[in-house]
UniProtKB/Swiss-Prot annotation:
Name of the protein described by the UniProt record: Protein TAX-1
Gene3D superfamilies xref list: Tetratricopeptide repeat domain
Effect of a null allele: RNAi-mediated knockdown results in reduced mobility due to defective flagellar beating.
InterPro entries: TPR-like_helical_dom_sf, Zinc_finger_MYND_domain
Biological process, per Gene Ontology: cilium-dependent cell motility
Species lineage: Eukaryota, Discoba, Euglenozoa, Kinetoplastea, Metakinetoplastina
Repeat positions for TPR: 157-190, 199-232
Organism (species): Trypanosoma brucei brucei (strain 927/4 GUTat10.1)
Keyword Cytoplasm assigned: yes
Origin: domain of life: Eukaryota
Subcellular location per the Swiss-Prot or TrEMBL entry: Cytoplasm, Cytoskeleton, Flagellum axoneme
Length: 363
């Protein structure tokens, strides 16, 4: 009967209990994280019997161990989410709990602990506890030095980047430059010096130079970021244009709507966190160059053109149109209406159906 409360007999209740999967971590929260971890650790060490007991025990340990790793990864991700949302104290508490469980599972000297140290360092930096953050990063550095064969360029790049941003926040700019330079080197080794992921290091380094009032060095690095991203965005946007044109050629009916949605898969594949960082970086460069050089400068126009292309990539065409039209107006005034730079901006407007003829962007 709908809405009625059903009574469960003891035998049925026991049977239902037996159906609970001990490896299920779907509904584990912070209050049940440690008890579930203890349960899984005991389960992993449970003895096996029968034929091929040794092989069965090994397979069992591997299976349960994989679940524990998933549980710890989820805890680390949740700790990071708390920090992103600005809840520093909760992120610190969650980070400490996660680190302690990782120490029990991996051992206190394992490289697998380093991401937890990075999180706690960033959390303490957010809370302006710079001394604590430096101490935590020093522990991470010691673990990396103790495990040279397991510490790859990725973890070294993150170590130096985290150190560099910490020292920048603490106004220790010279040592910040040293660490961010090391981070740039490792990212270049991993991805190449002209890869879009390496631009994050260039941007961090440029910001420190700007804080030190070394504006020539800062502007040179900002322009390096712009050049790398312009090359990348031209390529991925050209793919989107080509896909759209191909779709128009094969559409069956005149009233079919052809959009750019398919091509934007490259933006989605880049990841939400990376896209958020890129947005912050490109808007930051535009704002800095607008403030230093004014909106009418061709360098600022190039930054605004780049920002427009990025917004096209993430499918924010209305916002992109504002920046592209403004960049076109500035470029027309500086170079002339028939200059290749102006023509380039107009080509992208045509390809993405942004009207520009007779449009004057506000300066």
């Amino acid at each position: 009967m709908q809405g009625a409360n059903l009574k469960v007999l003891p035998s049925t209740r026991a049977a239902a209990k037996e159906l609970v999967d001990p490896l299920d971590i779907t509904n584990v929260g912070w209050s049940t994280l440690e008890p579930k971890f203890d349960e899984l650790m005991q389960l992993m060490d449970a003895p096996s019997s029968g034929i091929n007991a040794l092989a069965a025990r090994s397979a069992h340990r591997e299976k349960v161990g994989a679940v524990i790793e998933q549980l710890l990864t989820r805890a680390q991700d949740e700790s990071r989410r708390l920090l992103v949302e600005g809840n520093g104290e909760a992120a610190a508490e969650a980070g400490v709990k996660t680190l302690r469980l990782k120490e029990r599972f991996y051992g206190k000297g394992s490289v697998k602990l380093v991401p937890a140290h990075f999180h706690l360092a960033r959390t303490n930096q957010f809370l302006k506890r710079y001394g604590n953050a430096e101490e935590i990063l020093s522990l991470a550095h010691f673990i990396i030095l103790q495990n040279p064969d397991e510490a790859d360029a990725t973890i070294k790049a993150e170590l130096h980047q985290t150190f560099g941003l910490l020292y920048a926040a603490d106004n220790k700019l010279d040592v910040s430059v040293k660490h961010l330079t090391c981070a740039t080197y490792y990212l270049s080794v991993m991805n190449g010096p002209e890869h879009v992921l390496t631009t994050f290091a260039y941007f961090d380094l440029a910001n420190v130079f700007a804080t030190k009032a070394c504006m020539e060095a800062a502007m040179a690095l900002y322009d390096t970021v712009k050049n790398i991203w312009l090359k990348h965005l031209r390529r991925v946007l050209k793919d989107i244009v080509d896909e759209t044109m191909a779709a128009k050629l094969v559409k069956r009916y005149d009233d079919d709507e052809v959009t750019h949605e398919v091509g934007h898969a490259s933006a989605r594949a880049f990841g939400k966190e990376n896209l958020a960082d890129v947005s912050k970086m490109l808007f930051g460069i535009f704002s800095i160059q607008k403030e230093r050089l004014t909106i009418s400068h061709p360098t600022t126009a190039r930054a605004q053109f780049l920002l427009g292309l990025y917004l096209l990539w993430v499918n924010k065409n209305d916002e992109a149109a504002e920046h592209l039209l403004s960049a076109r107006t500035t470029s027309q005034k500086f170079y002339g209406e028939r200059h290749p730079i102006v023509q380039d901006i107009e080509d992208w407007c045509i390809w993405f159906e942004i009207p520009f003829r007779g449009v004057a962007a506000e300066q």
